[in-house]
């Protein structure tokens, strides 16, 4: 990496206070589980909404809450099944 580039690696603060690299695959797997067998919902829509609100060293607990909030914010008259995704994440 040259001096003109920013390091875009984000980190997660675990409950014990240690940090680790943010792993989008872990988030994706949780969302795949939460959306399994629910029609009319999209893992990528939840990821996009949540990604806007992520920041470096975010606590792991906040990521969980953010996924719930992101799914809940997608609930509408046309996409009511996000309520079931949010419920699974709780």
Feature roles, as predicted:
Residues 1-90:
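Long, C-terminal-biased catalytic regions of enzyme "large/alpha" subunits
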């Amino acid at each position: 990496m040259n001096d003109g580039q920013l390091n875009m690696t984000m980190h997660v603060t675990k409950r014990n206070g240690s940090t680790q690299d943010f792993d989008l695959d872990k988030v994706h797997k949780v969302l795949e589980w939460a959306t399994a067998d629910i029609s009319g919902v999209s893992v990528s829509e939840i990821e996009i909404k949540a990604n806007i609100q992520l920041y470096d060293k975010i606590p792991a607990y906040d990521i969980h809450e953010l996924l719930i909030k992101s799914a809940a914010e997608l609930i509408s008259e046309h996409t009511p099944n996000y309520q079931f995704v949010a419920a699974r994440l709780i």
